Amino acid sequence: VKATIENIRIAEQDRSYNSYVLAQKAGQAFPSIFTDYWHYHPEIEITYIVKGKGLAFIGNKTIEFEPGQAFLLGPYLPHNFVSTEEEDVQMEKECWGLQFTQEWLNSFKESASLQRLFRAMSYGINLGQFNPAEHQAFTTIVGKDPLRSIGAFFNLMAMIADRPDFLTVSTNNAYSNVMSQKLSRRMERVSKYIQDHY
C-alpha cells in the first residue's frame, strides 16, 4: 500500500496557510489522533507535539517523539505519528500543526534567507523541544487573530532559520512526489505492527 496523498485545500481557508489543533482527552475512545495514517502532501508542515508520545515515521526513518517536540516536514515527505502507549486510551494527546506552500512563502522576497532551511526540510527536521518563545509564537499562530497570527508565523520561521544547524531525520529527501512501493509497503507493515502490539 502506498502512502496516501492528503488534500489540504489551503485556498479554501480564510488564511494563507492552514493551522490546526488536534486534542484527545484521557479516556476518549479511539481512533487516536496519533494513528496509522502514512501520508504526504505538497505543503510544508510543522508538527508540534504538545501532549502524548510515540513514534514518528518520517521518510525512511523512525524516531521517538515526546511532549514539547516539533518537526518540520518538507513537501511530499511521507510521514506518520503513532502513539505507542500501552494504555493509549488513558493518555492525553494534543498536536498542533501548521501547513503552507513553499510557493506562498517564496512570494515574499524576504524569504530568500530561508533557502538553507528549505534544503534541510526536504529530509525532515527534528526541531527538538520548542523553547518558550517558539511555543508562544505557535500559540499565537493557532489563535483566532489573523493579523497577530501571520506576524507570529514569520517570527517562528525566523527563529527556526536562525538555528546554527538542523537535525535532519530521513536519509532520503522528499521523494519525487511518490516514494518507492517497496519502502511504502514496509513502513505500512511497521506502522500496523505498532498499532496491533502497543
Predicted regions and their residues:
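Ligand-binding loop in jelly-roll beta-barrel domains
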Residues: 76-96, 109
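Short, charged/polar surface micro-motifs in flexible loops or helix N-caps
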Residues: 52-53, 76-79, 101-105
